């Protein structure tokens, strides 16, 4: 099997993608798969036809282009098989506003509004969360407890993104649920509870060793664990996700509040999905092989 490994990319998550890609590359080498690395940059479209000579594309491009449905649509058009969700599901999950509207009534979502212009005070009161519609790795996310912090968040995000989501802050326990697709169906890995040393699970907390305590499995009673897993899988399936992914949310007062779906989650040494896989008895090389094989679970290319 010939594997094209796509890493890097043009988004603000480029460095994380390179870290994920290097780790996947080493795993492919250990597994004995013939592979070629593509460090995706602005000129990638000139080279995309080269991918036709490979059996499958292993996509570890985080953020815009690689995770938002753009790459997936190109690969579908060219008839190239790839890991992860299709273009439609990727688009839905990358844009949080679209995700919330699409999943409304399916899972419980904290109150939210879209803001396109500067405001002096939060329409949802405090504390609240300000975040971009289309971004990953908690880039551009602010937890605000005052007008001053809220105004600062808008001044940072509005010029860059044009519009932002303001969401009610739910105090509780941060949970992430990783899901793999195998021949037997969807496998839900052990629920991971995140206890960041910082204010919340931001970029630094995600990718710096020692900044976040991983509790695996999350200390939940059987009914709580069942609820968290059921709600996460419900969101994943409703959004049409495939292959592998991660569902993030807040567990508070016996309820699971959905926050987002990551269709190309990080695979670095500090990432959530590999940690959950290991807790479930799946070492990293096996995880990579499961993700790779999931691309072949449907005949032809996803449509």
Swiss-Prot record:
Q: Which reaction does it catalyse?
A: 2 D-alanine + ATP = D-alanyl-D-alanine + ADP + phosphate + H(+)
The catalytic activity of this protein is classed by the Enzyme Commission as: 6.3.2.4
- Which InterPro entries does this UniProt record tie to the protein? ATP-grasp, ATP_grasp_subdomain_1, D-Ala_lig_Van_CS, D_ala_D_ala, Dala_Dala_lig_C, Dala_Dala_lig_N, PreATP-grasp_dom_sf
Please give the GO cellular component terms listed in this UniProt entry: cytoplasm
Q: Which residues bind Mg(2+) 2?
A: 260, 262
The entry's keywords: ATP-binding, Cell shape, Cell wall biogenesis/degradation, Cytoplasm, Ligase, Magnesium, Manganese, Metal-binding, Nucleotide-binding, Peptidoglycan synthesis
Q: Which residues bind Mg(2+) 1?
A: 248, 260
Cofactor needs: Mg(2+); Mn(2+)
Q: What class of enzyme is it?
A: ligase
This protein's pathway reads: Cell wall biogenesis; peptidoglycan biosynthesis
What are the GO MF terms of this UniProt record? ATP binding; D-alanine-D-alanine ligase activity; metal ion binding
Question: Which residues belong to any copy of the ATP-grasp domain?
Answer: 99-293
Task: Extract the PROSITE patterns matched here.
Answer: ATP_GRASP, DALA_DALA_LIGASE_1, DALA_DALA_LIGASE_2
What are its GO biological-process terms? cell wall organization; peptidoglycan biosynthetic process; regulation of cell shape
Q: Which Pfam families match?
A: Dala_Dala_lig_C, Dala_Dala_lig_N
Where is it located? Answer: Cytoplasm
Q: So where does ATP get bound?
A: 125-176
**PANTHER family attached here?**
D-ALANINE--D-ALANINE LIGASE (PTHR23132), D-ALANINE--D-ALANINE LIGASE B (PTHR23132:SF23)
Provide the family line.
Answer: Belongs to the D-alanine--D-alanine ligase family.
- Describe the function of this protein: Cell wall formation.
* Protein's UniProt name: D-alanine--D-alanine ligase
The organism of origin for this protein? Thermotoga maritima (strain ATCC 43589 / DSM 3109 / JCM 10099 / NBRC 100826 / MSB8)
Gene that this sequence comes from: ddl
């Amino acid at each position: 099997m010939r594997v094209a490994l796509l890493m890097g990319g043009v988004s603000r998550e480029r460095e994380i993608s390179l870290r994920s890609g290097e780790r996947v590359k080493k795993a492919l080498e250990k597994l004995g798969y013939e592979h070629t690395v593509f460090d995706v940059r602005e000129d990638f479209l000139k080279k995309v036809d080269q991918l036709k000579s490979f059996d499958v594309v292993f996509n570890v491009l985080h953020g815009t282009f690689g995770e938002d449905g753009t790459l997936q649509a190109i690969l579908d058009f060219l008839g190239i098989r790839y890991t992860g969700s299709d273009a439609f599901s990727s688009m839905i999950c990358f844009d949080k506003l679209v995700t919330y509207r699409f999943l409304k009534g399916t899972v419980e979502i904290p109150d939210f509004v879209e803001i396109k212009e500067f405001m002096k005070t939060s329409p949802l009161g405090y504390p609240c969360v300000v975040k971009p519609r289309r971004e990953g790795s908690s880039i551009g996310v602010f937890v605000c407890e005052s007008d001053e912090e809220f105004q600062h968040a808008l001044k940072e995000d509005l010029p860059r993104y044009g519009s932002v989501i303001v969401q009610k802050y739910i105090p509780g326990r941060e949970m992430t649920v990783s899901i793999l697709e195998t021949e037997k169906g969807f496998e839900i890995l052990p629920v991971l509870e995140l206890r960041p040393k910082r204010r919340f699970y931001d970029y630094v907390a995600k990718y710096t060793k020692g900044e976040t305590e991983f509790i695996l499995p999350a200390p939940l009673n059987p009914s709580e664990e069942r609820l968290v897993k059921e709600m996460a899988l419900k969101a994943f399936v409703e959004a049409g996700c495939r292959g592998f992914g991660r569902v993030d949310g807040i567990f508070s007062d016996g309820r699971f509040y959905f926050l987002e779906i990551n269709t190309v989650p990080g695979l670095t040494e500090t990432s959530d999905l590999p940690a959950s896989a290991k807790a479930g008895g799946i070492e990293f090389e096996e995880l990579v092989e499961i993700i790779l094989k999931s691309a072949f679970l449907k005949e032809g290319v996803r449509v």
